[in-house]
Amino acid sequence: MTYPLLTRKTLMKKTPLALLLTLGLLQTPLAAFAATAPLDLVGPVSDYKIYVTENIEELVSHTQKFTDAVKKGDIATAKKLYAPTRVYYESVEPIAELFSDLDASIDSRVDDHEQGVAAEDFTGFHRLEYALFSQNTTKDQGPIADKLLSDVKDLEKRVADLTFPPEKVVGGAAALLEEVAATKISGEEDRYSHTDLYDFQGNIDGAKKIVDLFRPQIEQQDKAFSSKVDKNFATVDKILAKYKTKDGGFETYDKVKENDRKALVGPVNTLAEDLSTLRGKLGLN
């Protein structure tokens, strides 16, 4: 499914004023553009919307296959598809989280529910993860699978109509690293499947994409900052590469050595702190 409005070719046909309106850049106070002119943000924001749209299209496609396997009772296939499917959600989480109702339905963890796994509103990926990896069953999971697929399709529709706030886009890089620091390094995100490294990679890829798209604007303000961020991303990538499997996936998180977990803490926390200043550097606070 494609959205003509989101293609760069279509966007570039618009007048400068129309572009600013389409991408929400006139909703930002004029004082916010002390560091970066509004038109300088048009390209990065439009490209990021395309990136998010493409990832959500993949999310819908992969979720269809994942939920089909769950409904067929094919536990082995469902387990295999669980983590690779989630990557597409994790990479665009800052935008997905703008729809709090869907985020809670798609990605809430057992800790978010007072009644735990018995809670009626505990749905989505992690509820299916619990059934597949903790209980080793797909029994009675059909309705949850159907709801997950319905929710990601709803997300796709909402994102297509969304005006991307530039401050949310830029702030998303830090949000993704904070997510890694808070739940990925500890291994609590995917506690039943231990597939946290997939989520980890999705968060890192999403943050890198934002940095890369805004790189010209960042380097115009602070070239040393850009180099420091790249160095810390490279450190994280080097550690993650140790645990990649031949099929392009990752080892389970319980196989990550303690010294590597500790080695990830420094660069991840530094990235989260540094990227939290990015909005200010671009005048988007």
Swiss-Prot record:
Where does it mainly reside?
Answer: periplasm
Q: Does the keyword Cell wall biogenesis/degradation apply?
A: no
Name the Gene3D superfamilies for this protein. Answer: M75 peptidase, HXXE motif (1.20.1420.20)
Instruction: Give the record's GO biological process terms.
Output: iron ion transport
Which superkingdom? Bacteria
Query: Signal peptide span per the entry?
Result: 1-34
* GO terms assigned for molecular function: metal ion binding
Asked whether the UniProt record includes ATP-binding among its keywords, one would answer no
Keywords from the UniProt entry = Ion transport, Iron, Iron transport, Metal-binding, Periplasm, Signal, Transport
Question: Where does this polypeptide localize?
Answer: Periplasm
Can you quote a single GO CC term? periplasmic space
The record, for InterPro entries, names: EfeM/EfeO_iron_uptake, Imelysin-like, Imelysin-like_EfeO/Algp7, Imelysin_sf, Iron_uptake_EfeM/EfeO
Give the function comment from the record: Part of the iron transporter system efeUOB/M involved in iron import. Specifically binds Fe(3+), which is produced by EfeB-mediated oxidation of Fe(2+), and delivers it to the cell inner membrane permease EfeU. Also binds Zn(2+) and Cu(2+) in vitro.
Free-text comment on this protein's domains from its UniProt entry: The peptidase M75 domain contains 2 metal binding sites, site III and site IV. Lacks the N-terminal Cup-like domain present in EfeO proteins that contains metal binding sites I and II.
Record's subunit section: Component of the iron transporter efeUOB/M complex composed of EfeU, EfeM and EfeB.
Family to which this protein belongs: Belongs to the EfeM/EfeO family.
Q: What is this protein called?
A: Iron uptake system component EfeM
Give the species: Pseudomonas syringae pv. syringae (strain B728a)
